[in-house]
Every structure is written in C-alpha cells, then in structure tokens.
Amino acid sequence: MGEIKHIIHPFEPVYDASSKVLILGSFPSVVSREKNFYYMNANNRFWKVMEALFQKEIHDKKQFCLDHHITLWDVIYSCTIEGSSDSSIQNVQVNDIPLLCQNSNIQAIFLTGKKAFQLYEKYIDLDIEHIYLPSTSSANAKMHLDQLVESYKVILEKL
C-alpha cells in the first residue's frame, strides 16, 4: 500500500463568501497531495460526476467550484495514514469547518464517503443540514458512474 506517515492537509479549501454548498471528503489521496488539488486521482470519478451533473466539461476545477458556489474541503486537518487508504487513518485532527461556514453562505454540507461522514458526525456540531454521499473513489467500484450521478443530484437542489 504505502508508507505510514503523519501528514498535515497540504492545501486550502476552495471557497468564497458566496459559497452555498460544502463538499467534504476525508483526506486527499497521494495523487491529490502531489497535484495539490482535490480529487485528482485519475481513477476517482468526482470530476466526471460534476461534469455529468452540470452538463459541461470542466477545465478549471477551482473556477468551476467558485462559479457554482461550491466549497471543496476535507474533514481532516492532519492524520496518520498509509498511502491513500481511509481505513488506515488514525490520530485525526479535524479542520475548522465551523469557522469556514461562518465566513460563507453554506446551506448544506455533503460528505463524500463513509469515513468523511463518520468523522463529521463524531467531531463537528453545526446547525446545517449534512448529507452522506457515496465515495467517488475507485475503492467504491461497485457503484457505476450513472449511480453516482443520481446520488449526487441532491447537490443541485441546494444551489
């Protein structure tokens, strides 16, 4: 799998004051950490799902999020992790999600995957609706792209 390391989240959230939805993953994959942006592993289907939902090709991922009032971030600020494996995550410190929500117009929070959802429920207490979404990672290969797109349509209702 990979070396076990204690890692601090390497990049900032994508957001501005007009953000309406917050999409939270658990922690960036090795590839995302190398490429310094969210969901950058070629096998992760997050950006394919977004393209299908919004019916457009996404070239500038950060600008796409800002244009559509989407904040991207992760629940975890730092952790011990082996490679990209959520199941190996230990020694978690969470990001200051309440502060981010105070500085934007977040009306709904979406958690992409079981680990993100579990950690959010354990550590974060906000009076904002939070919704579980299935992981777009290749580790969730049992879900086909069309099933993921169907699950993620709820995001459009909150924009």
Place the predicted regions along the sequence by residue.
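C-terminal capping/extension of enzyme domains
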Residues: M1-K20, N41-A42, G83-P98, E121-L159
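Short beta-strand segments
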Residues: L24, L111-T112
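Proline-aspartate-enriched helix->loop->beta-strand connector
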Residues: I97, C101, N105-I109
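Short, hydrophobic/glycine-enriched beta-strand segments
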Residues: K20-S26
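Hydrophobic packing residues within well-ordered alpha-helices of enzyme cores
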Residues: M50, L119-Y120
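Short, surface-exposed acidic-centric catalytic microdomains
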Residues: V31-S88
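Alpha-helix capping/helix-boundary segments
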Residues: K115-F117
